[in-house]
């Protein structure tokens, strides 16, 4: 009976944890719309971190970069390499977009593990990484969709839509469906990974001593960085594909 009671209490604890993480939200009313306030708060914090870091790093640029300037130039070079590899020689105008996506997702993912969101109490719900919310990841995926449609139409005009009947008109439904599955796969992959990572850490912290979840937290940081890179790489690949033709 003691074992059964312990098991029931453990399952109840897991249910309570998952309910707090997933089901409750702090809503704001903005212009007649209901938005998730905690997502806006954490997104603003992430944006402030990015803008503040960039401002501090480049406020006094040197010919021979050092410190923060050197780090940001390395990050910029890395983003340029990713963009050039996926888009091709016309990658230049898309570096800011790909870089913004990568940095926002990277810092958002890491903020869920490194920033003490729990100390800020809300009337409902709790603060977590912005990418922990499906609304954020869907918005990022839709922005990517708009970007690759814009890239294709700018490069080819209305001839861009010819890709839907290549290599044969029979594939028209499948080619149309592909454009719907791209944002779905981008958004749910990122959302699922970040949500699962945070839930696993919370469950382990509640069940075992604090030292045990640390390796899982480090693994979560690694996978969070990989997810940011995957999202940015796929976004660049979709843009490059729309400019070059259907593959």
Swiss-Prot record:
Q: How does the protein associate with the membrane?
A: Multi-pass membrane protein
**Cell location:** Plastid, Chloroplast thylakoid membrane
Protein name in the entry: ATP synthase subunit a, chloroplastic
Q: What is its main location?
A: plastid
> In which family does this protein belong, per the annotation?
Belongs to the ATPase A chain family.
Query: GO molecular function: any one?
Result: proton-transporting ATP synthase activity, rotational mechanism
Alphabetical list of NCBIfam families matching this protein: ATP_synt_6_or_A
The cross-references to InterPro entries, in alphabetical order and at most eight, read: ATP_syn_F0_a_bact/chloroplast, ATP_synth_F0_asu, F0_ATP_A_sf
Keywords attached to this Swiss-Prot or TrEMBL record, sorted alphabetically, are: ATP synthesis, CF(0), Chloroplast, Hydrogen ion transport, Ion transport, Membrane, Plastid, Thylakoid, Transmembrane, Transmembrane helix, Transport
Where exactly are the transmembrane stretches of this chain? Answer: 38-58, 95-115, 134-154, 199-219, 220-240
Q: How does it assemble?
A: F-type ATPases have 2 components, CF(1) - the catalytic core - and CF(0) - the membrane proton channel. CF(1) has five subunits: alpha(3), beta(3), gamma(1), delta(1), epsilon(1). CF(0) has four main subunits: a, b, b' and c.
Query: What GO cellular component entries does it have?
Result: chloroplast thylakoid membrane; plasma membrane; proton-transporting ATP synthase complex
Name the HAMAP family for this protein. Answer: ATP_synth_a_bact (MF_01393)
Q: Which Gene3D superfamilies match?
A: ATP synthase, F0 complex, subunit A
Query: What does the function comment of this entry state?
Result: Key component of the proton channel; it plays a direct role in the translocation of protons across the membrane.
Q: Which organism is it from?
A: Panax ginseng (Korean ginseng)
């Amino acid at each position: 009976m003691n074992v059964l009671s312990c098991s029931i209490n453990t399952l109840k604890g897991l249910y309570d944890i998952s309910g707090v993480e997933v089901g409750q939200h702090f809503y704001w009313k903005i212009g007649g719309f209901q938005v998730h306030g905690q997502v806006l708060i954490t997104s603003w914090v992430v944006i402030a971190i990015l803008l503040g870091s960039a401002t501090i790093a480049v406020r006094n640029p040197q010919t021979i970069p050092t410190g923060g300037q050197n780090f940001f130039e390395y990050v910029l070079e890395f983003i340029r390499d990713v963009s050039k590899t996926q888009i091709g020689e016309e990658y230049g105008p898309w570096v800011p977009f790909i870089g913004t996506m990568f940095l926002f997702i990277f810092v958002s993912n890491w903020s869920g593990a490194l920033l003490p969101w729990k100390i800020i109490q809300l009337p409902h719900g709790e603060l977590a990484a912005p990418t922990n919310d499906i609304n954020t990841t869907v918005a990022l995926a839709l922005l990517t969709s708009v970007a690759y449609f814009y890239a294709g139409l700018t490069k080819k005009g209305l001839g861009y839509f010819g890709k839907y009947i290549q290599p044969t008109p029979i594939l028209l439904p499948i080619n149309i469906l592909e454009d719907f599955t791209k944002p779905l796969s981008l958004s749910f992959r990122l959302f699922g990974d970040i949500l699962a990572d945070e839930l696993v850490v919370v469950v382990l912290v509640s069940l075992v001593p604090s030292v045990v979840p640390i390796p899982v937290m480090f693994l979560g940081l690694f996978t969070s960085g990989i997810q940011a890179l995957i999202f940015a790489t796929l976004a660049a690949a979709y843009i490059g594909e729309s400019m070059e033709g259907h593959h």
